[in-house]
């Protein structure tokens, strides 16, 4: 492809890119803003050091965060060097160090043909360990796996008992980590965390191996440097020799994975630590000026950054202001997003809807379906396919139709009631020999006193609960029914009682989704109608479409770009999230602001920001303020079109309050807000 050949014509690089690529020796940090051509710089750098500085390409490490990026570099470099390189040193951290580990496996008591376990296998293994340690079944396998993963990322070994206990409050975590690790060695296997931690152990405990490797490696290139964690950064430093040929490309303003262990300090402190210069790439080839100025003015409110300002170098895209809309309710906001897309939609242009919380997706999905617009969710399941939603729906389905065996199996022991495989087998065998559904079979066993007292005490509350829900179906609103199931089943408590920090964050999102399920229920009169709606929504999505609208969280949007971008829900408590507001630390707020920067810079020319002044959650109307990030955008780049609706357009559904939208409370607050913040 033309682009690849160009990547080596140095005269096609802009001035800053060229300075970076032609850097001679020693460390360099390239601060590459959104859309400034960092892949081209990395590739050109690789080719430049081979062709011009005469480095051997087998002795260059190029680390990326995805296989896709690694393949892109290989492909472009192969083209430019006209020569097919199969270097073990180009790839992700995990692929590079897995090869290293196979060579030196015996240093950590493994054989070189060790297996890398996927998450299913890891779960099976930890389950054995938890049973062996007699840990209460209430705590799930993945909590322990996550915690062990975190310990590994923090360079804490199973034998560092005091460090483990200082870091984690999980019951018996020190013993479990230890036994889990022994089991891995016994079955000649590693998990993802081991690939890096074992390599770190080998390099720090065997001076000869470390020296051999650091002398062999002539140059190291790192992509997405702002996403590195402690362990990854330390591994790289162990492979550096005295020339310190380290070329890091990254953007501190796009560091949004702190919750996964990424350390923004790595990139912020790099220039001091290595006493080196910083090349800033600021010419952006993606977005128009209004968008870049907005992104720059928002992110400039962060104190902890190295600093740079982007400027637009794409003459082919229209200059237009950012569209700002305020709505009375989330319902109205979602309807507008779908309606606006349906007016602009065509096969040539791309559309992205980026939300802060997954719970925002449900009402948007709903409206996209109403408008028959093709969409897909990137980086996660659709709303009604999410685990927590399917779990709670299974209660409703079983209560609605007691012969629904699939739902019965899904929830009989969820939340855990101590009803194990054996007990479930008794119920199923009885159902087969008596031609009953699973739930009828359980009721039959209970009525005829055929269950052991201990099993009976565990299953009776479940029978009572399902009967109670069945009874309520025709007596109460669906909204109240949903709340009843979520609370009385113990499902909400199970999510709230989480001990593990990472899981807590995930569970907050699950709880938001359950509240959103209650909102969805409140829009229907009866349960059958609602369940049919769910079936149709899921069916509707099986058909794929060439140019579908992409719906995703801001985290999943990193690295993507769209002609048209919609950023709904810019309200305090949603964005910045309530979690960040509760922590009330500069650190968590700055991370949210970086997310805003990532969101804004995904758009080429059409950017639509919106917020609702009230959101209906869990039966209550919550009023909220516009996000502080809106007031950080200079008003010169914004156009508030909240009250300009296409009133004369009769064939589109009217917005609920289109008649009085000019005077809606949201509108009034927006005006006050904008007047107050006129820059």
Residue spans for each PLM region:
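Helicase P-loop NTPase motor core
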Residues: 30, 34-42, 275-277, 282-374, ...
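P-loop NTPase Walker
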Residues: 2-112, 116, 211, 293-296
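Short, polar/flexible loop-turn hinges at active-site or ligand-entry regions and domain interfaces
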Residues: 54-59, 79-88, 103-117, 128-140, ...
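Short glycine-/polar-rich loops that comprise or flank the Walker A/P-loop
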Residues: 26, 55-59, 85-87, 121, ...
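Conserved helicase C-terminal RecA-like lobe
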Residues: 166, 361-366, 372-373, 386, ...
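Basic/charged alpha-beta structural segments of nucleotide/phosphate-handling enzymes
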Residues: 123-189, 207, 264, 372, ...
């Amino acid at each position: 492809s033309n682009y690849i050949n160009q990547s080596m014509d140095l005269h096609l690089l802009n001035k800053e890119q060229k300075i970076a690529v032609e850097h001679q020796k020693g460390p360099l940090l390239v601060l590459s803003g959104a859309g400034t051509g960092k892949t081209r710089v990395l590739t050109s750098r690789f080719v430049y050091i081979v062709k011009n500085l005469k480095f051997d390409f087998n002795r260059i490490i190029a680390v990326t965060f995805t296989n896709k990026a690694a393949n892109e570099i290989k492909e472009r470099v192969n083209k430019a060097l006209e020569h097919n390189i199969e270097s073990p040193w180009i790839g992700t951290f995990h692929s590079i160090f897995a090869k290293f580990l196979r060579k030196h496996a015996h240093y950590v008591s493994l054989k070189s043909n060790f297996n890398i376990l996927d998450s299913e296998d890891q779960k099976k293994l930890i389950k054995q360990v938890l049973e062996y340690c007699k840990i209460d079944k209430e705590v799930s396998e993945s909590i322990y796996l996550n915690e062990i993963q975190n310990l590994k990322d923090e360079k804490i070994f199973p034998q560092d008992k005091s460090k483990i206990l200082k870091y984690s409050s999980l019951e018996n975590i020190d013993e479990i980590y230890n036994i889990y690790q022994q089991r891995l060695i016994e079955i000649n296997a590693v998990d993802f965390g081991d690939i890096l931690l074992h390599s770190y152990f080998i390099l720090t405990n065997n001076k000869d191996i470390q020296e051999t490797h650091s002398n062999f490696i002539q140059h190291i290139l790192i992509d997405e440097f702002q996403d590195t964690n402690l362990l990854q950064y330390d591994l790289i430093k162990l492979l550096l020799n005295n020339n310190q040929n380290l070329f890091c490309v990254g953007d501190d303003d796009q560091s949004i994975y702190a919750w996964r262990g990424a350390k923004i300090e790595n990139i912020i402190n790099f220039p001091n630590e290595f006493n080196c210069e910083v090349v800033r790439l600021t010419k952006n080839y993606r977005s128009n000026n209004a968008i870049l100025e907005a992104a720059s003015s928002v992110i400039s409110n962060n104190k902890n950054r190295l600093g740079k300002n982007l400027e637009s170098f794409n003459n082919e895209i229209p200059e237009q202001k950012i569209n700002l809309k305020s709505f009375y309710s989330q319902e109205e906001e979602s309807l507008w997003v779908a309606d606006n897309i349906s007016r602009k939609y065509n096969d040539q242009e791309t559309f992205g809807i980026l939300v802060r919380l997954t719970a925002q997706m449900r009402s948007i999905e709903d409206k996209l379906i109403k408008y028959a617009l093709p969409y897909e969710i990137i980086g996660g399941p659709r709303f009604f396919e999410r685990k927590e939603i399917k779990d709670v729906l299974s209660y409703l389905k079983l209560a609605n139709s007691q012969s629904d065996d699939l739902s019965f199996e899904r929830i009989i022991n969820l939340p855990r009631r101590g009803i194990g495989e054996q007990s479930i087998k008794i119920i199923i065998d009885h159902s087969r020999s008596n031609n009953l559904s699973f739930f009828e079979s359980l009721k039959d066993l209970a009525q005829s006193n055929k269950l052991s007292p201990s099993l009976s005490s565990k299953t009776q509350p479940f029978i009572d609960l399902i009967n109670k829900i069945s009874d309520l179906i025709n007596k109460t609103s669906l909204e109240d029914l949903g709340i009843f199931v979520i609370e009385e089943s113990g499902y909400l408590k199970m999510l709230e009682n989480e001990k593990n920090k990472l899981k807590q964050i995930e569970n907050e999102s699950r709880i938001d989704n359950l509240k959103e399920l209650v909102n969805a229920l409140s829009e229907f009169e009866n349960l059958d109608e609602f369940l049919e709606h769910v079936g149709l929504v899921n069916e509707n999505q099986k058909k794929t479409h060439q140019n579908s609208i992409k719906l995703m969280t801001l985290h999943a949007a990193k690295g993507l770009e769209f002609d048209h971008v919609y950023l709904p829900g810019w309200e305090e408590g949603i964005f910045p999230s309530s979690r960040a507001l509760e922590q009330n630390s500069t650190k968590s707020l700055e991370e949210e602001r970086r997310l805003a920067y990532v969101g804004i810079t995904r758009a080429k020319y059409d950017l639509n920001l919106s917020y609702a002044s009230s959101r209906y959650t869990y039966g209550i109307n919550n009023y909220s303020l516009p996000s502080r990030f809106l007031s950080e955008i200079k008003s010169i780049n914004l156009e508030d079109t909240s009250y300009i609706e296409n009133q004369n357009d009769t064939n589109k559904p009217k917005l609920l309050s289109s008649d009085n939208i000019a005077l809606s409370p949201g509108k009034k607050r927006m005006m006050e807000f904008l007047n107050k913040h006129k820059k």
